[in-house]
Design a protein with these regions (language model features):
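Short, well-ordered beta-strand micro-motif
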Residues: 108, 114-116, 184-188
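Cytochrome P450 core scaffold surrounding the K-helix E-X-X-R motif
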Residues: 122-128
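Active-site-proximal beta-strand elements of phosphoester/diester hydrolases
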Residues: 1, 112-118, 168-170
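Active-site neighborhood of divalent metal-dependent phosphoester bond hydrolases
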Residues: 31-110, 134-142
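Active-site environment of divalent metal-dependent phosphoester hydrolases
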Residues: 2-6, 30-32, 59-63, 121-122, ...
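N-terminal active-site segment of His-dependent metallophosphoesterases
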Residues: 1-41
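Conserved beta-sheet core of the metallophosphoesterase superfamily
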Residues: 129-196
C-alpha cells in the first residue's frame, strides 16, 4: 500500500540467495505515500531474483475503473494517493501499465497456493471467480478448503499472522493503520517458516 520504507525494512532483513523466489501478494498501491516507488522497487528486485507478482484488490479496482463500482472503490480506498505518487492518473499506465496488466491471480507450487484474498471453498481452483481471488473474506477464512496445498493469503488484516492447518494470512493492516507492520513470510525448503516485520 505505497509503504516503500516498510518494504525496504522487510527486504533488508532477508538474506537472499539467487534461487530464492519472491511472491508479492498484491495491494502495492493506494493509501501510502509512494505507490510508484513500491512498484519500482519490486520490479527492480525482479532483475536479480525470480519474482511472482500477484494482483490485489486495489490493483484489480485500478484496472477496472471504467466500471462505476470499481471507480468508486479506487476513489474512496486510497486511489488519490496513487495518483499523487505518479503525478496523474494517466501516468500510472504510462509508467507501469504492463506491470499492472500482467499481474497473476495466484501462484501454485507443490506445497503452497499464494493468492491475494483466498478462494471460494465451493469450487475447484480452475473454476474460481477472479473477483473471489482478490476480494473474498469470511467464507474462505472460516471454512476448510479441499486443496492439498497450504494457502498463503492477505487482504483481511489481523493483529498478528493468522495460522490454521490449511492457511496462513500475513496481512497486518500495513497502509491502513499508521502503526501496522508489513509482514513477510519466509518458507524454507525444510518446511520451517519465519515471519519478518517492518
Amino acid at each position: 500500500h505505497g509503504e516503500l520504507k516498510k518494504l525496504e525494512s522487510v527486504l533488508s532483513q532477508i538474506d537472499t540467495r539467487p534461487d530464492d523466489v519472491f511472491v508479492f501478494m498484491g495491494d502495492y498501491i493506494d493509501r501510502g505515500p509512494d505507490s510508484r516507488g513500491v512498484v519500482d522497487r519490486i520490479i527492480a528486485l525482479g532483475e536479480t531474483n525470480k519474482c511472482i507478482y500477484l494482483i490485489g484488490s486495489h490493483e484489480y479496482a485500478l484496472l477496472h475503473t471504467n466500471d462505476e463500482y470499481y471507480q468508486f472503490l479506487f476513489d474512496n480506498y486510497g486511489g488519490p494517493a496513487t495518483v499523487r505518487s505518479y503525478g496523474s492518473f494517466e501516468n500510472i499506465f504510462k509508467v507501469h501499465g504492463d506491470f499492472y496488466r500482467n499481474l497473476k491471480f495466484y501462484y501454485l507450487t507443490d506445497k503452497y497456493l499464494f493468492v491475494h484474498a483466498g478462494i471460494n471453498p465451493d469450487y475447484p481452483l480452475e473454476e474460481q471467480d477472479e473477483v473471489d481471488l482478490v476480494y473474498i473474506r469470511g467464507k474462505f477464512i472460516y471454512s476448510k478448503h479441499k486443496l492439498p496445498q497450504k494457502i498463503i493469503f492477505g487482504h483481511t488484516e489481523f493483529d498478528e499472522p493468522y495460522i490454521d492447518e490449511g492457511k496462513i494470512c500475513i496481512d497486518l493492516g500495513c497502509g491502513k493503520y499508521p502503526d501496522a507492520h508489513l509482514c513477510a513470510l519466509i518458507l524454507n525448503e525444510d518446511g520451517t517458516r519465519e515471519f519478518v516485520y517492518s
